[in-house]
């Protein structure tokens, strides 16, 4: 079970905080569990691990099995919360090199998360003539990046299989009742899965948004959802035995005492895209009204050779949260080298996991001594159950954190600014006057 250790952060606080924060945490927890807080129309994720739609869940498993049987590749089209969680889980549990490994499941390509011509062309070339399917994920169907990518891959499918057969290879995860993608899916007969109205994109990993690609990769969804339900039960406790309470409280107090950025660190490279998901989760949920810790991530030990200098001796505005996994089942042992030219024979016979753990502990002590508070998240294993626990833990703590800040943890009004400018510069109907003004400013 996930556990939290705040002992390397509490010494940075000038006053005890638990008793003072308790009433505010109780209120925040009440808003998450019962509604009444800002954005309460979007708290469906809170009970999702218990109350998910069993019928749709069965259809997800059936669709995943079909894709595994008729496709060598699945193209997942989505941006932000529509793909980061799924990619994070797949890479963490199945490997960042998933597509290069020998396996019985299809390759999975994530696209529609940017506007790069090179990225789009590369995925098209990698698929080549292989049989493939598409999972397009968009609540509205009009978000620029995924909508443009879907045009390309829908055309490729229809040219390869014909319109009728192509429709059997397109899976639309979208709004249950409205929107451009919903209308197209109804018209063309695509199999449809639902983006729930009461769950925002960054909180949607455990809905069809994340579950279909994750299932195609061969991850055990029962274990994933089981882990999330275990953490849901633990997070329902309104006291400091709840790890989400501890995490939200410590982050909030460190923020109040001047910390401005939080680094999420892990000593396993496979965790990279889980950290990308975490960055969106906390960045969009807290970063408003000129408030919030800036979420960043580092891959250790690699980034100790790039960002390590700043973390150790740069401006003292950082805090760190470190995710630690239990030792790997398959151990790599350092061989003995008779020449010992590198002077590393003192490591011979030791496992890489042992060496990595000494690096973790050494880094922890150095950073804390250097003025960087550390929160440790310990996971028993790197498997589907613990991943479900971690996802729910981060989501619940994020909701608490947003309410402690006094912001709405479930909206993201700031992301519209760039979109309006982009539409104006692209000549979208209705934006002509704005486009002229922006072009003048760019001269």
Task: Identify the residue ranges that each predicted region occupies.
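Extended, charge-enriched "interface" segments that sit outside catalytic cores
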Residues: 1-68, 336-342, 346, 434-443
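Glycine-rich phosphate/diphosphate-binding loops that line cofactor/substrate pockets in enzymes
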Residues: 59-72, 123-131, 250-260, 311-316
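Short, charged beta->alpha transition segments
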Residues: 62, 117-125, 248-251, 324, ...
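Glycine-rich phosphate-binding loops that contact phosphosugars or nucleotide phosphates
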Residues: 65-238, 424
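Short, solvent-exposed amphipathic alpha-helical segments in soluble enzyme
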Residues: 91-94, 125-127, 151-153, 186-188, ...
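Active-site phosphate/pyrophosphate-binding segments
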Residues: 161-321, 326-329, 412-443
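Helicase-primase coupling helices
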Residues: 296-383
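C-terminal helical cap and adjacent loop that interface with cofactors, partners, or active-site loops
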Residues: 363-426
């Amino acid at each position: 079970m996930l556990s939290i250790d705040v002992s390397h952060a509490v010494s940075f606080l000038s006053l005890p905080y638990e008793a003072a924060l308790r009433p505010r945490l109780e209120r925040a927890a009440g808003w998450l569990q019962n509604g009444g807080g800002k954005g309460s129309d979007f708290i469906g994720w809170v009970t999702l691990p218990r109350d998910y739609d069993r019928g749709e869940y069965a259809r997800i498993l059936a669709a995943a099995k079909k894709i595994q049987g008729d496709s060598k590749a699945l193209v997942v089209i989505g941006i932000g919360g529509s793909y980061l969680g799924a990619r994070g889980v797949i890479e963490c549990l199945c490997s960042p090199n998933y597509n290069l490994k020998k396996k019985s499941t299809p390759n999975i390509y994530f696209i529609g998360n940017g506007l790069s011509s090179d990225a789009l062309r590369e995925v098209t070339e990698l698929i080549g003539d292989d049989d493939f399917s598409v999972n397009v994920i968009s609540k509205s169907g009009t978000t620029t990046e995924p909508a443009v990518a879907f045009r390309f891959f829908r055309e490729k499918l229809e040219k390869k299989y014909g319109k009728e057969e192509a429709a059997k290879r397109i899976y639309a995860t979208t709004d249950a009742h409205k929107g451009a993608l919903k209308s197209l899916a109804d018209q063309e007969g695509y199999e449809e899965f639902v983006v729930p109205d009461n769950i925002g994109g960054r909180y949607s990993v455990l809905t069809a948004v994340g579950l279909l690609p994750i299932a195609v990769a061969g991850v055990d969804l029962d274990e994933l959802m089981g882990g999330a339900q275990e953490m849901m039960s633990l997070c329902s406790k309104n006291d400091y035995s709840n790890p989400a309470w501890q995490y939200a409280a410590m982050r909030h107090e460190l923020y109040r005492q001047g910390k401005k950025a939080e680094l999420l660190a892990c000593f396993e490279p496979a965790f990279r895209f889980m950290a990308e998901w975490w960055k969106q989760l906390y960045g969009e949920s807290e970063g408003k009204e000129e408030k919030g810790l800036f979420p960043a991530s580092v891959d250790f030990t690699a980034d100790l050779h790039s960002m390590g200098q700043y973390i150790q001796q740069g401006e003292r505005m950082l805090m760190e949260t470190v995710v630690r996994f239990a030792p790997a089942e398959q151990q790599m042992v350092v061989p003995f080298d008779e020449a010992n030219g590198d002077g590393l024979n003192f490591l011979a016979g030791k496992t890489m996991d042992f060496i990595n753990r000494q690096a973790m502990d050494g880094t922890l002590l150095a950073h804390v001594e250097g003025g960087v508070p550390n929160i440790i998240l310990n996971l028993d294993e790197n498997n589907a159950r613990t991943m479900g626990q971690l996802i729910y833990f981060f989501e619940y703590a994020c909701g608490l954190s947003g309410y402690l800040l006094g912001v709405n943890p479930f909206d993201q009004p700031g992301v519209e600014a760039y979109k309006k400018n982009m539409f104006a510069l692209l000549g979208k109907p209705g934006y002509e006057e704005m486009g002229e003004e922006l072009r003048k400013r760019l001269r």
